[in-house]
């Protein structure tokens, strides 16, 4: 029977209400489907790599079958999680927008006649790195699609992924205070780290690094769940000039 370990790094011990609401609904939904769920929150760890590694360390002490990172600034539809579990992929994630407003896409949508109340649907900027990408590729929204890498903000990982990767990653002795008293001076495997990509010399974030070593060291695969509808919550500075009003474009006489 599947058992999902929800892991959330919470710097400052804070989360958004949308996240909490989704999480509580998810718990009820999984219980109704006879799927066990536990939550692990890590507070006040400023280094995200260390936070994720510590959460994995805690997960591996349990008998849970799947670990799912859900970050505290993600608003998700709980109904999207069970299909991710049933997809039976080693690593599967949802694609969420970056914390920015895609003004160019909003402008294009407005010019195309999209009603004002629907413009927010076009405000997101997404990064999707499909496998075998060639020009346009049609993706079925109800089936997993393989990708090179994805974000850990909403990612489900099977236990065997970490068990296979253990022998391929370094480890370190924990020297930080754990307020919960669960981690002493224990050895923790470094599944998440930053690294420089050899070919493009890009600095990889901890989630892209994880996906890369899973692919390179274990010939693993990473998948996206196109059906997952996610929001990425952040702060925004709201600007405006009271006296400024948009003017309609003037027609030019020929």
Question: Where does each model-flagged region fall?
Answer:
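Conserved catalytic core of nucleotide-sugar-dependent glycosyltransferases
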Residues: 56, 77-193
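Short beta-strand-to-loop acidic/aromatic patch adjacent to the donor-nucleotide binding site
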Residues: 64-75
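C-terminal catalytic/acceptor-binding lobe
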Residues: 2-5, 167-254
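Conserved donor sugar-nucleotide recognition element shared by glycan-biosynthetic enzymes
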Residues: 48-52, 124, 207
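Cationic, hydrophobic amphipathic alpha-helical membrane-interacting segments
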Residues: 12, 33, 38, 100, ...
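Active-site nucleotide-sugar/metal-binding loop of Leloir-type enzymes
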Residues: 53-66
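N-proximal low-complexity "stem/linker" segments adjacent to membrane-targeting elements
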Residues: 1-46, 50
């Amino acid at each position: 029977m599947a058992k999902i370990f929800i892991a959330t790094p919470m710097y400052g011990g804070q989360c958004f209400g949308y996240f909490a609401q989704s999480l509580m609904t998810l718990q009820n939904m999984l219980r109704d489907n006879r799927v066990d769920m536990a939550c692990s929150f890590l507070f006040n760890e400023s280094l995200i790599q260390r936070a994720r590694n510590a959460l994995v360390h805690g997960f591996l002490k349990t008998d849970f079958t799947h670990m799912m990172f859900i970050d505290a600034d993600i608003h998700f539809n709980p109904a999207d999680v069970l299909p991710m579990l049933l997809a039976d992929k080693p690593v599967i994630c949802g694609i969420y927008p970056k914390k920015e407003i895609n003004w160019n896409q909003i402008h294009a949508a407005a010019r195309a006649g999209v009603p004002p109340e629907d413009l927010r649907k076009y405000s997101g900027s997404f990064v999707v790195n499909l496998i075998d990408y060639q020009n346009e590729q049609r993706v079925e929204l109800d089936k997993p699609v393989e990708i090179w890498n994805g974000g850990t903000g909403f990612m489900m990982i099977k236990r065997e992924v970490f068990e296979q990767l253990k022998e391929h990653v370094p480890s370190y002795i924990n020297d930080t205070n754990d307020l919960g008293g669960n981690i002493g001076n224990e050895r923790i495997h470094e599944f998440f780290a930053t690294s420089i990509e050899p070919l493009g010399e890009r600095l990889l974030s901890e989630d892209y690094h994880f996906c890369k070593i899973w692919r390179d060291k274990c010939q693993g695969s990473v998948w996206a769940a196109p059906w997952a509808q996610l929001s990425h919550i952040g702060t925004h500075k709201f600007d405006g000039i009271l006296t400024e009003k948009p003017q309609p474009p003037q027609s030019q006489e020929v």
